[in-house]
Curated annotation (Swiss-Prot):
PANTHER family named in the record: AEROBIC C4-DICARBOXYLATE TRANSPORT PROTEIN, PROTON/GLUTAMATE-ASPARTATE SYMPORTER
Keywords: Cell inner membrane, Cell membrane, Membrane, Symport, Transmembrane, Transmembrane helix, Transport
Lineage per the UniProt record: Bacteria, Pseudomonadati, Pseudomonadota, Betaproteobacteria, Burkholderiales
Protein name: C4-dicarboxylate transport protein 1
InterPro entries assigned: C4_dicarb_transport, Na-dicarboxylate_symporter, Na-dicarboxylate_symporter_CS, Na:dicarbo_symporter_sf
Major site of localization recorded for this protein: membrane
Membrane topology (UniProt): Multi-pass membrane protein
Family assignment from sequence similarity: Belongs to the dicarboxylate/amino acid:cation symporter (DAACS) (TC 2.A.23) family.
Classification via HAMAP family: C4_dicarb_transport (MF_01300)
Any one of the GO BP annotations: L-aspartate transmembrane transport
Ranges that cross the membrane: 5-27, 42-64, 77-99, 150-167, 188-210, 225-247, 314-336, 351-373
Gene that encodes it: dctA1
Length: 428
């Protein structure tokens, strides 16, 4: 029997977002007090992300029985991430030149108050590639889970799963136990997701109530350019990749619409991570590929963030009437490819990576970030939506490359069949 429309999760989340926007606009003081609802939901999701990643990755690797395969999947994933991320950076740069969102501002650099972005600049200077690599190694196993650091948990899971794989049948009992624990945590996620509309309402009401729709007006061109560019990236770049892999990007987006709406409401792509992993398995991707690709993509495959970074640099240079040479722009691209990974997992990562990138081009003052500080919150939704879509597509692509994509199940799900399907033999 079909559910009444008002009981469907994405309908509830969409309605909650609309109500949140209305409350924020008409009753801003009351709306600001709704912030704990959004924060609470995100905290509930973050509470289970670590255990889910650990159990899923360990179970997947232990089931491979071949560490060469683990390295092969990881290598293909990183190669894919780097190529697609570079496309995103270039598209952001080109779009900035085509639409010129910063032209006409004519801001005097001496009139900018840099105090508001000083903390981001300081963090950018203290963050290096070496620091990033060292921070992947946790001081203790417990510390990694206590902080909820995805990369640290992923490292522990890789080592633990590799050890179980090497032990073979002797470790089967442990592998089965961890697999059952994963099912328990996914069930917890289902329970938490029931309150997603409340979280989306609280987060959206706070955003509109605190910043107001009026604050967007002076920078609407930049916001519009960024959203349009992100849509073009998803439809064209990810669309072509999806078509070459054998599925439609539009049907894929429709398939993960609930996760996208949760991300839209909370501005946090992490809030949908557990559900995305489960959805990818139901789509026909193998558990081992899902466990490796999706968590890794949350640090190394940030397409929306990459578009934002290069476009923001161009916007600031145009607003300050600073001409960038071709060499400087190529340098920005090269540095952004590194900084976008080096600050993953850090609070305010988008601004920190932007500060680190600007620091390489002395002609653009880091203080110029003040110009977009006020609207960054409104652009974060688009970054998160693009990031999660890109990671979902990457998971399907890597599964296809590994010949571990169940195309029968993929075709059924993409055609609208959401019921249980009998797994067919995986095909390329």
């Amino acid at each position: 029997m079909k559910k009444p429309f008002y009981k469907i999760l994405y309908v509830q989340v969409l309605a909650a977002i609309v109500i949140g926007v209305l409350l924020g606009h008409f009753e801003p003081k009351l709306a600001v007090n709704m912030k704990p609802l959004g924060d609470g939901f995100i905290q509930l999701i973050k509470m289970v992300i670590g255990p889910i990643i650990f159990c899923t990755v360990v179970s997947g690797i232990a089931g491979m029985r071949d560490m060469k395969k683990v390295g092969r999947v990881g290598g293909k994933a990183l190669l894919y991430f780097e190529v697609v991320s570079t496309f995103a950076l270039v598209i952001g740069l080109v779009a900035g030149h085509i639409f010129n969102p910063g032209s006409g501002f004519n801001v005097d650099v001496n009139s900018i108050d840099a105090k508001a972005v000083a903390q981001y600049a300081a963090k950018a200077q203290s963050s290096s590639t070496v620091d990033f690599l060292l921070n992947i190694i946790p001081s203790t196993v417990v510390d990694a889970f206590a902080k909820g650091d995805i990369l640290q948990i992923l490292l522990i899971a890789l080592l633990f799963g590799g050890a179980l794989s090497a032990m073979g049948e002797r470790a089967q009992m442990v592998t089965d136990f961890i697999d059952q624990i994963a099912h328990v945590f996914f069930r917890i996620v289902h329970v938490i997701t029931r309150v997603a509309p409340i979280g989306a309402f609280g987060a959206m009401a706070f955003t509109i109530g605190k910043y107001g729709v009026v604050s967007l007006v002076p920078l609407l061109k930049l916001i519009g350019t960024f959203y349009l560019t992100a849509i073009i990236f998803v439809v064209v770049v990810l669309g072509i990749i999806a078509r070459l892999t054998g599925f439609s990007i539009f049907r894929f987006v429709a398939y993960i619409k609930e996760e996208l709406l949760i991300v839209l409401g909370t501005s946090s792509s992490e809030s949908a991570l557990p559900h995305l992993m489960e959805k990818m398995e139901k789509l026909g991707c193998s558990k081992s590929v899902v466990g490796l690709v999706v968590p890794t993509g949350y640090s190394f495959n940030l397409d929306g963030t990459n578009i934002y970074m290069t476009m923001a640099v161009i916007f600031i240079s145009q607003a300050l009437n600073i001409e960038l040479t071709l060499t400087q722009q190529l340098t920005i691209l090269a540095v952004a490819m590194l900084t976008s990974k080096g600050a993953s997992g850090i609070t305010g990562a988008g601004f920190i990576t932007l500060a680190a990138t600007l620091a390489v081009v002395p002609t653009i003052p880091v203080a110029g970030m003040v110009l977009i500080l006020g609207i960054d919150r409104f652009m974060s939704e688009c970054r998160a939506l693009t990031n999660i879509t890109g990671n979902g597509v990457a998971c399907v692509v890597i599964s296809a490359w590994e010949r571990e994509l169940d195309r029968t199940k993929l075709a059924r799900v993409m055609s609208g069949d959401r019921g249980e399907t009998v797994s067919a033999t995986p095909a390329a």
